[in-house]
């Protein structure tokens, strides 16, 4: 029979996704067949599986940590906000509809038997499932129809460990408040607490641990030290802490436009890990500076984000940068914005029917109801072999003054030839639908060399850090960190359904 453990958090960005990934790697290293599971994920960071199904990125990196291929069953429901009131609802990788919160709140009850069936299919194939909740289980206005926190735990009778982020402050209030806002049945499901991102001497924390255990009758089974691991971040909250000022000691200054509805910012993880590269996120005109490369990322509402560029003054700044021979790359929605105009006659993305683009590429995009979700391999205009994935609802046509950026050779593992993207005559402006383009080492190394040559400097002096290899190392570091700082014997008992009590054993931080 499958063992299971569910990680819930006191708030968003408490560390649930990373903790699940670490536990998956830990159990995988012990020879267990383990998979992650999150019944419902709200995120603009998504991935396309080998079968062309769309799922949340968090469950992808958790699957990588578990040593298995991403499977849409690990994240059956994906919600992609299109605006402040509506989300695109995706079930098992396929779009169902756009729904507002009230409509979806009523509708999601119909998904419960389907979610249970999906979960059971994973349970039949694995030894352990590590479940992840969303936000906080104490969203008491939503709990009557919850399908992702205590509602999911009840569906499959999973024990829960609550994780709280001490780095933000107020950790004991968040633990106590979360537990006490739950009803009696839900409180009984919480079998342990983990305090995350602790800095300092754990002895100073111990009086608080003793008090919170006494108040809640729930044992603290781990204190995880703050660790500077280079792992993907899925929650857009994490962007709030990203740099906006360039690093004067870096070889290259790369600026990403931080769109209000930015999607797939995981595209830039490969850039973040490279030595002597300054990666920063531009939110307003004052942050623009003098970058060596400007990247316009994907967007879940391209027309509205184009309007943001106009209103903020960033549109003119990007145009001026390009006119002065600056290098600009647009990914997916960013590619669409580089063109002359975007048309949305059926209001697929926005209430706007048409909007002018940046005018840096001779292209025009029309939005369609049909979403393209594929994994691809191809060859760029300069001969680099690349792979990645596409997620978009627009069709872009090139004019005569542009050339295709990439020749696609295979789609979802099947031979298929077509052209992707566009590149300007002077090669300075590139647009592509390929997410993950920067994860290709040769392409990235050549890009760095080009940017440095434009500055009359020698080529990039470092070997490109391969993202896949780098992540494998980070997953192992994470697993070791968790094993050293969680009372694994207590966690094993929880997973077996055995009762554990508040003990006198004190957690000790191990780096």
From Swiss-Prot:
Domain of life assignment: Bacteria
InterPro entries on file: Class_I_gatase-like, CobQ/CobB/MinD/ParA_Nub-bd_dom, CobQ_GATase1, CobQ_N, CobQ_synth, GATase_3, P-loop_NTPase
Gene3D superfamilies reported for this sequence: 3.40.50.880, P-loop containing nucleotide triphosphate hydrolases
Family per similarity comment: Belongs to the CobB/CobQ family. CobQ subfamily.
HAMAP family documented for this protein: CobQ
Residue intervals of the GATase cobBQ-type domain: 251-443
Pathway: Cofactor biosynthesis; adenosylcobalamin biosynthesis
Protein name: Cobyric acid synthase
PANTHER family: COBYRIC ACID SYNTHASE, DETHIOBIOTIN SYNTHETASE
GO biological process, one term: cobalamin biosynthetic process
Keyword entries, A-Z: Cobalamin biosynthesis, Glutamine amidotransferase
One Pfam entry name: CbiA
Annotated catalytic residues: 332 (nucleophile), 435
UniProt cross-references to CDD domains, sorted A to Z: CobQ_N (cd05389), GATase1_CobQ (cd01750)
Stated role: Catalyzes amidations at positions B, D, E, and G on adenosylcobyrinic A,C-diamide. NH(2) groups are provided by glutamine, and one molecule of ATP is hydrogenolyzed for each amidation.
GO molecular function, one term: catalytic activity
